[in-house]
Amino acid sequence: MRLYLFTLLVTVFSGVSTKSPIFGPQEVSSIEGDSVSITCYYPDTSVNRHTRKYWCRQGASGMCTTLISSNGYLSKEYSGRANLINFPENNTFVINIEQLTQDDTGSYKCGLGTSNRGLSFDVSLEVSQVPELPSDTHVYTKDIGRNVTIECPFKRENAPSKKSLCKKTNQSCELVIDSTEKVNPSYIGRAKLFMKGTDLTVFYVNISHLTHNDAGLYICQAGEGPSADKKNVDLQVLAPEPELLYKDLRSSVTFECDLGREVANEAKYLCRMNKETCDVIINTLGKRDPDFEGRILITPKDDNGRFSVLITGLRKEDAGHYQCGAHSSGLPQEGWPIQTWQLFVNEESTIPNRRSVVKGVTGGSVAIACPYNPKESSSLKYWCRWEGDGNGHCPVLVGTQAQVQEEYEGRLALFDQPGNGTYTVILNQLTTEDAGFYWCLTNGDSRWRTTIELQVAEATREPNLEVTPQNATAVLGETFTVSCHYPCKFYSQEKYWCKWSNKGCHILPSHDEGARQSSVSCDQSSQLVSMTLNPVSKEDEGWYWCGVKQGQTYGETTAIYIAVEERTRGSSHVNPTDANARAKVALEEEVVDSSISEKENKAIPNPGPFANEREIQNVGDQAQENRASGDAGSADGQSRSSSSKVLFSTLVPLGLVLAVGAIAVWVARVRHRKNVDRMSISSYRTDISMADFKNSRDLGGNDNMGASPDTQQTVIEGKDEIVTTTECTAEPEESKKAKRSSKEEADMAYSAFLLQSSTIAAQVHDGPQEA
């Protein structure tokens, strides 16, 4: 094989550059007559994809003379042997140069712009002479750590003779191995001489785990003396050419490592070059650099030694030279196969800057915004939790078409927002076990993978959103309402209720959108957003969320589980929202029932304003019956007559008292109607009724007008001066009680009067018995 077909290509890439987003190889080496391909990367923007690309040579004066450009320009010295190709889909352009000469050695720039002073990257090209080798020399080119098999032919007459391989050093040839199993100490365990099958005209020497020291000239020989068969071999051992990786800040990168079947069973690793050493950042034995905690995975691909390492949430300091390898220790070892990369992190990232750490409290919630490529709005979105055990893995917890994992039932949902480049993941009912690292993923552009660290602290106060009770039961076929209380800071935000399922959380319609089976209403004055199920069906059972959001940005949420059951006979279901009202009614009924006459054991149902008159009539009729029975009686009836007279003398005054009470109630009702009619007068500015006066104190001056949550409006010279207090203050405990109108006060006075009258009657009745 002719020598010029083999090229020594050593590429060394520069460190992180923050001055220019253009990236390429810093040094390129080759030999005369060979060719090189130089790849330069540029940021992913429409302008960069369509602007001029160029390759120029720097002179002693600092000027850079264009040799070739994407506009079609080609200099004379490159005519017929160079071209420039733009790959906009990869955001790269490649300069190919053939028939290299030593005159091509020099300093160059690859760049973008209408002039050569635009964005650029410096490249040094060195072209060396072809090494002088014997004409019959066979050249083998291998990478460090790989194996080489040298083929040594011979004549049949030398078949019984000794075979050997030696390495030339100065004027001598040092033995490597021979057919008598003699091996140089430097090659023990690495060199092997053998023949294949029945072919007696060729022997082979295999050398494994090649190092730089193995490079040089070798001679393989069969036989001795002038009749011996000899062959010259030139072994070139090169460091693997680094692969360029151009990634945006906050994006992800994957290192695909293929080391060969011979190391399939060895431990694998990825390390980063640090001057003369390579520091392991992860290996399959469980070692992991703390700087990459929560954002790195190592994954075996197959049984042929292939594996990959994924790093998400790239930072500026992640740029550098990386190397993957395999060894039983999980650490870099000389003579073992490796692959190398040069990673460039572009700070002009298209991925939006999001919080890398989200904080929550136990019992609370978090809403995490995950970015994705806006051009791939139809892509599937996922959210997974990073686990560091073993080689690390990230099981999917929820996705746009993936059901929520069972352990996250009722507290995890993904909200897809097509078109704006963001989807939101909400996790509520937080516990300390939820703390950890989570990844945002799509099935589209793999660069758009981001990492979020969730920190959960113990709650020190009540949550902002409160739904009580936490476990509610609704009755089938009835109306059920549950309310969610929110603080003042959420006043301007949109409030919503949604029904959770393992495919998401469906937002329920509000009353403004029309009456439906499930609807939501919001009372801003009481800071309550209520959800009503009307009528309740079995399908309504499950988890519901109350939450707030600002436009497309989701905020806090809280969850409640609503059970649905059928009504059983003799049971009555009390809606939590009506509990206080029903308790008040029960109290009033208890006051009225206390007026039952113990003697007659008859209750007065639905006592009205004239109930006392009916009771007086009943008492009068009963007195007349007692007198009639006294006149028709015998001597024994005369004793009863005396008792009847005592009872009559007692009940007559009682009847008079009841009559006076009835008159008092009638007067109070008449006055109430007059007051209402009098205060119903309205002007074009103000409507006033008795219900507007909370109590007698409201008729006086207000000591704290600034604390009023209502808008105060004053007309000055035909202009409206509106003063609105946005501060939300809590009313005193007394003011939170239900305010009574004049009618309610009269009813309460009447009920108390009946109770007192019943007590007096009982005392009078017991008096004669004791006598």
From Swiss-Prot:
Glycans are attached at N90, N147, N170, N206, N420, N471. It comes from Mus musculus. InterPro entries: CD300_family_receptors, Ig-like_dom, Ig-like_dom_sf, Ig-like_fold, Ig_sub, Ig_V-set. The gene is Pigr. This is Polymeric immunoglobulin receptor. It comes from the Eukaryota. GO terms for biological process: detection of chemical stimulus involved in sensory perception of bitter taste; epidermal growth factor receptor signaling pathway; immunoglobulin transcytosis in epithelial cells mediated by polymeric immunoglobulin receptor; receptor clustering. Residues 669-771 are cytoplasmic. One of its GO terms (cellular component) is receptor complex. The keyword Cell membrane applies. Interacts (mainly via CDR1-like domain) with dimeric IgA. Interacts (mainly via CDR2-like domain) with pentameric IgM. Pfam families: V-set (PF07686). SUPFAM superfamilies: Immunoglobulin. The Ig-like V-type 1/D1 domain contains three complementarity determining region-like loops CDR1-3, which mediate interaction with IgA and IgM.
